[in-house]
Design a protein with these regions (language model features):
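A short beta-loop-alpha structural element at the N-terminal edge
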Residues: 2-16, 20
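Active-site rim helix/loop that mediates acceptor-substrate recognition in acyltransferases
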Residues: 34-56
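Conserved beta-hairpin
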Residues: 49-69
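Conserved acyl-donor/pantetheine-binding loop and adjacent beta-alpha core of acyl/acetyltransferases
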Residues: 66-125, 131, 181-182
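Conserved GNAT acetyl-CoA-binding A-motif
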Residues: 117-119, 146-159
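Conserved acetyl-CoA-binding loop-helix of GNAT-fold acetyltransferases
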Residues: 126, 132-145, 169
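Conserved active-site alpha-helix within GNAT-family acetyltransferase domains
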Residues: 137, 149-151, 160-177, 183-184
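C-terminal "cap" of GNAT-fold acetyltransferases
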Residues: 152, 156-161, 180-205
Length: 205
């Protein structure tokens, strides 16, 4: 997998991939149901700007697939970005939509484990034009190799049950489930314990 760390210079490409990848997602298509495309793009750009504070947003060379990680001890948004996110929600979604989005985010926060330090996979998406070639899972597998080298654990939320088995094949196990408000979809949380790097083969004289 030819992957690299994304920077702010890649924001346009990364944001387009994530926005299109999650356009039909059971959770986020409902949470962002009212804004036009420009409004939805503003949400994703702000979210990604928060993640790009860390060197853990990964992309294939042309941005066909993107993974967004928050490293141990990190936050998805700075306090200033959180305030901007709330203002954007109110202006784009209206009071009722902003209230729903706030309730959705509260569900994610409540379910998130806060014991053992871990890498948090906030987003993983493949551009629709490049789906079906395993790029997203290959990028995730590459990232996990780096996380394993640190002996760190990893956590994610699966907003689409069709992906659960794919995550399980990479070592994630069921951690829990929660329902979103107003009879919203079920989100599955998954945990991958820390592992050491693969041992080097023993060379015999």
């Amino acid at each position: 997998m030819d992957a690299r760390v994304a920077t702010l210079a890649d924001l346009d490409v990364v944001a387009e991939t994530i926005q299109l990848a999650f356009a039909d997602d059971p959770v986020w298509s409902r949470a962002f149901a009212h804004p036009d495309d420009r409004g939805v793009a503003a949400f994703w750009r702000l979210w990604l700007e928060g993640a790009l504070r860390y060197p853990w947003v990964w992309m294939t060379q042309a941005g066909e697939a993107v993974s967004v990680w928050i490293p141990p001890g990190g936050d998805e948004l700075s306090p200033e970005q959180e305030a901007a996110f709330k203002r954007l929600a109110e202006s784009s979604l209206g009071r009722r939509g902003a209230s729903y989005l706030d309730a959705v985010m509260a569900c994610f926060t409540e379910a998130h484990p806060h014991g053992e330090p871990h890498y948090y996979l906030s987003l993983l998406g493949t551009h629709p034009a490049h789906r079906g070639h395993g790029l997203g899972m290959a990028l995730l597998a590459e990232n996990l190799t780096r996380i394993d080298a640190e002996g760190a654990a990893a956590y994610l939320e699966s907003s689409n049950s069709a992906n659960d088995q794919r995550y399980q094949r990479l070592g994630f196990a069921l951690h829990g489930r929660f329902n979103l408000p107003d009879d919203g979809p079920i989100v599955t949380t998954m945990w991958r314990p820390g592992r050491g790097p693969e041992p080097s083969p023993i060379r015999r004289p």
